[in-house]
Regions:
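Class I S-adenosyl-L-methionine-dependent methyltransferase catalytic core
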Residues: 1-132
Length: 132
């Protein structure tokens, strides 16, 4: 997993082969962030929420591009541990990994976000329950 641009550009993190989730490809990330660049002012240090964080690939890219805070929600214990480990290596205090269920977190969360990214790794019957 590689960071495309920003302060962590070029950093690599090896994902264990045992992971169910695969990182968002560089091609997909580049296209996603090319679109987002038209809507998000990275210099304004937005606050972001990464739901179903998986490998943390999007979390890393958001941090690298200048988000003042990124909260990452991941339910799988191994994936959460991996996300926490690379955040610890980076010593980035703007990253807040949370191990837990996305829907439980959202039902209790009162914080406002400038950007919310949701990429569930499976078909979600509750997708309509995600707030706008």
């Amino acid at each position: 997993m590689r960071v495309i641009t920003g302060k962590y550009k070029g950093r690599h993190f090896d994902i264990p082969r045992t992971f169910k989730a695969r990182p968002t490809t560089d091609f997909a990330k580049e296209n996603l962030f090319n679109v987002l660049n038209s809507y998000i002012d990275w210099d304004a240090e937005p606050v972001a929420l990464d739901l179903f964080a998986g490998t943390g690939s999007i979390t890393l890219e958001l941090l690298s591009r200048g988000c003042s805070r990124v909260i990452s929600i991941e339910k799988d214990p191994l994936h959460f541990k991996f996300i926490k480990s690379f955040i610890d290596k980076l010593q980035d205090l703007n990253a807040i990994p949370i191990k837990g269920d996305v829907f439980k977190y959202l039902s209790q969360c009162r914080e406002k976000f400038d950007f919310i990214f949701a990429d569930p790794p499976y078909v979600l019957t509750e997708i309509s329950e995600l707030p706008d």
